[in-house]
Amino acid sequence: MKLCRFKNAESEVRVGLAVDESTIADLSAAGVESITSLLEDTNSTQRISDLAERDLPQLALSEVKLLTPVEGQEVWAAGVTYLRSKKARMEESDFSANAYDLVYEAARPEIFFKSLPNKVVGPGEAVGIREDSKWNVPEPELTLVINSAKQLVGYTIGNDMSSRDIEGENLLYLPQAKVYDRSCAVGPWIVVGANEAEV
């Protein structure tokens, strides 16, 4: 099942559920106020399944504007998620190379703050790049959706923009290299009720 946020022809922000590749059901017509409230439900997968069975208004995707599914949440990211990334970062920075020695071995996860919701862009919107960087790169990510009870409730996709030359100059510059206006894109869909193999 795939959830989304969208604007309808009247510019109202609504919550939708994919019916097929070109149609969504309007969950807001059933009283769903937000994706967050839906995913905070301890039995969210069953609730969404029940909603899918209802006779709700349907809209063509071509008639709506898909939005990022991030409503009011922070976005956090896991750093250096594959071995090639670790090696590249060690090669790019004499100053910071030793900082990556403990990646995958440290007791604490390599997680860092990425974005506030107002800096996240949605589907079809341009991501930002830093003007003072000569090497801005997109980093496509599998994105986990976790509710306030720390339950994994869904998956989406993200794009973590990075200014690699700034990061490579000094590891302490990581926030400047990662957190800036439009440095994060998320969505449009949140896949719920799927196991890891299906994602």
Question: Which residues are covered by each model-predicted region?
Answer:
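Active-site microenvironments in enzyme catalytic cores
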Residues: 4, 46-199
